[in-house]
Amino acid sequence: MDNNNNNVFNNNSDICQQLLQRYSKSSAPQHHHLCAIAAATRSIIQSESLPITPFSYFAVTISTISNSQDSLDPQELSGVSSFLAIVLPLVNQEDVSLDKVVEAIGVLVGILEKGLLESEGVLGTSTVRAFVKCLGILVGFCDKEDWDSVKVGFEILVKFSIDKRPKVRKCAHDCIVCLFKSFGSTAVAKKAGKRIYSLIKENTALALKLSALKEISGSKDEHQEVLHSLNILKPIIPYLTVKDNEKVLAQLVELMSSQSSAFTRHIFDNIGTILDSSGVEIILPEADQIIKALVSYMSSAENPADNVLFAANLAKGIIDKLHDGGMSVWVTYLPLVVGSISGLLTRPENIALPASNILKELINGHIDGKKFLTAKKQTVDDEALSGSEFEAVKAICLVFENMLLSSSEYPNDHILAILSVMFLKLGEVLDFCEKGIILKLADWMIVASGGAYDTKNLQECIGSAVVAMGPEKLLALLPISLNTKDYSLSNSWLIPVLNKYVCGSSLGFFLKHVVPLAVSFEQTSSKVKKSVIREELQAYARGCWGLLPAFCHCPSDVHKKAEALTTLLIPFLKEDSFMLEYISAALQELVNKNKNVLASDNLSEELIVHQTENENLDLALEFKRRCSYSKKSASKNIKALASCSEEWLQALVNVFFESSPAKYQQFKEAIECLTSITDSSLTQRIFTSSMERAGITNDIGEYRKLGPHSTDNKENNSTLLEEVAKRCMILELGSCFIEGSNEDLIEVLFGIARDVLEASHGAGHHEAYHILSKILEKHSWFRSSHLEQLMGLFASVKPPTDTKSLTSRFACYKTLLIDAIQGNMDEENTEAFLILNEIILALKDSTEEGRKTAYDALIGVCSSLRDSSSAKSDESYKKFVDMIIAYLSGSSPHIKSGAVSALSVLVYSDANICLSVPDLVPSVLTLLQSKDVEVTKAVLGFVKVFVSSIQAKDLHNLLSDIVNGVLPWSSVSRHHFKSKVCHGHRGDLDEEVWSCRS
């Protein structure tokens, strides 16, 4: 019978009555017996005029057991024990005197001891468990400073904690744990701890004896007792005294020497618990033996995977404990533990992956290359390199080096990942201890380059070395050199690795070492007769030149080498030069990185775009850390770059005029970033010169307007198109000058764009709208001072039909519309409605491209308003939605349906809009009463979008309005209304209706 049911009884009402109510209808004999015992006990209580309380039931029951225990048969004892197990938890400790507690303990101990002595089966499991439970409660009632009152009962609980019956044993375990929790730091706690230690000591001796016999199967009961004692130990370790834990740990270490696999996990569990709950002073004396035993255990391939990994974690925990406790001995054990766990990296995946994670935690927690640098962290500290910590690092490196050298197999991903972590943690001291590893990895890279292996992870591993030690040291170890006899190139595989992972190097190194290498390849290629070899050498040369952008990832000497770099590279700026793309990327890297630092309040939030594809988070973060400047350094760098920017700009503008439009994109962004740091007067002078060069200025150097051109004949039309083409080219160039332009130059650019829009019928409109959109985006003063002119201009020019021009026109509208809404919250803005009107009408465009452009414009406005940092962003967003809703009351069905389509777009992108603007859905649904086909189609489309986008709980309040509005159209067969309602909405509505019902 289950005795764990006291939680369903309470001490505020008669227990007998509670039992009768619960079990009177039960057909189980034990329930009848229990009710009979309760009734008999109540009769005794009443006959003696005692109160009907749990204590009275307890006192009478104990008295009955004491007086009749010799005459009670097992079945009767079972019933009495069950009843007592129900009653006793309901008794308040204050109600029971200590004398009565001791007396009751004596009664129960007598029964339980008798059960231990008699043959198995006299007392059933449930009976023993019930009495053990009661004994545990009674011992808890004893005086916590009087061991004599506790000793007898506690001793019996300890004996039953290794009982062969699981339920009895579990009950005894629970009682002992509860008692230790209640003992606290009392005198009784110390005595109880000693008793547990003696139990462990006895069973340690037994385990060693069994191990010596090497026939555990022949001593099964004794073997089980050892396991049970280890099981009871784990939960009470946190409550033992420091001294007891020291002695227990010593016993566990001795038990480890038994080499019995049956005890291993239990021993590990208990050592782990001691590790977690104790100070380093307990671990230190036994650390050496434990570490060596764990290392020995991990080295055996026959041991279970779970236990091996537990041992690895345990060894790591000991290292952590010693390290955190300030015990220098951790340095001695670290290589031993790392070496042992590293052997698991070649095991099956279920072992290798967790082992890899454990090693990463060990390395990240205990190896730091910065410790071996001087205070300024610029040079290696020779004294630190001779210390014990660095000796440990070298020993660990030797472990991995030997692993690579002793194996003929390609290193797996786990080994490479660990090496990556090691490289990054060692940083600038990497070349003092990992040269052998890097050389071996290079050998594998040469082998793998033939296509035998996937080199992605190997390249990433070597990339970590590049990030850690820098390309200068790596190339000193693995030089890229040309064999002049057979023209073979050593370590050519390094070029793409450097291209991806160089950061924080120096332009000086690139100029002094990489450039001469590229030049030598070019010179040698010109002397080679065989075309295949010549092309290979040229490719190597390009590869070296292609490292330019990589060496511009946060170089340390921009302020010193900007001029030298300019002198070297400007001659390469020609239209057909392969260097054009490299130079453009390098300039953007140099300028934008430093600009971002100056503009950013939080450097850690900067993104390194070229590194986002890296899956190794540690590597990416380290790359990011190294690729950063202080604001002071960035300011010096920008100043140096600005001093050369005029020369760069002029050279790039020359390339612009020599190139075809198809190649503009290669260098436009470089021009744009340079103009942003160049003095605006210089920028204006260069642009004015470009206008003259394009032939669009008059005799005094001012812009020459197109003027009236007749397009009646081919000759006049051709002349106009030629003039427009010149202005388009200048507008294309001008779009790169926007950020660094002063107001005068912006006015010039606006004049050219306006001239093109007014004078031509579509030609050049894309370029004109594009530059206007950039001006509006970058210069707020222009938006406020030229609003009327712009609106007049846009009104006078027919909306374009080509997608590019329309997209750029709507980009202008987006900026103006957002500005108008946010700037005039309390007023109606005519310009805003004019803009919105055109976008809404475009939603009804006959072409899919035109409609999509309008959709994108609407979503862009919504996103900007919604995500704005302005305190009134919510208010602005709602105002925009209200403006669209206002069109629903318009007179034109075309504009009404367009407005409904616009709202469909907004709901599709953000269904919550229906909740933040409560009038939205009802306003649309009222249009279902309209007789106009176009409007009805749009509303039915809106309903479909709305129903499929919103949550069922939010749909509930609107469901009846939707159903009442939509269903009447299900009977209209014209214009496909019936099919739209029945097929287009039925599934969505059915699903939502059932969701709302549920």
Question: Which role fits each region the language model picked out?
Answer:
Residues 1-998:
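Extended, low-complexity, acidic/polar intrinsically disordered regions
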